[in-house]
Amino acid sequence: MALQDKLKQIGQAFAGITNNCYHYWRAKKDLPCIVWAESAEDTSFNSDNKKSEQRIVGTVDLFTRTEFDPLADQVQGVLNTLGVTWVLNSVQFEEDTNLIHYEWEWGVTFDGEVEEQP
């Protein structure tokens, strides 16, 4: 699967649990909201002088004003459904915005072979 196709799958899955789902940034007015982003390539493998397996890592953040927001469980459900590795990295109350902020780190490994472009 191509990199962009896999990333689109991730975004579509999160958009399935809330209309307030953003890639890289968040609208200040829409809460609760999810922001997800890929951040880097992690340990990957090359063979025959080309990428044979690629691991991409990223984050998904939930911003809410609701204590014990059920959307947090839905995010974890999506991560499990996607078949990615993940960890709940932090949960914090942001005093400057009065928001509860959950952050998960995720990683996905897939065939990194890229089709040659004409």
What are these regions (language model features)?
Residues M1-V57, F63-P118:
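Long, contiguous binding/interaction regions
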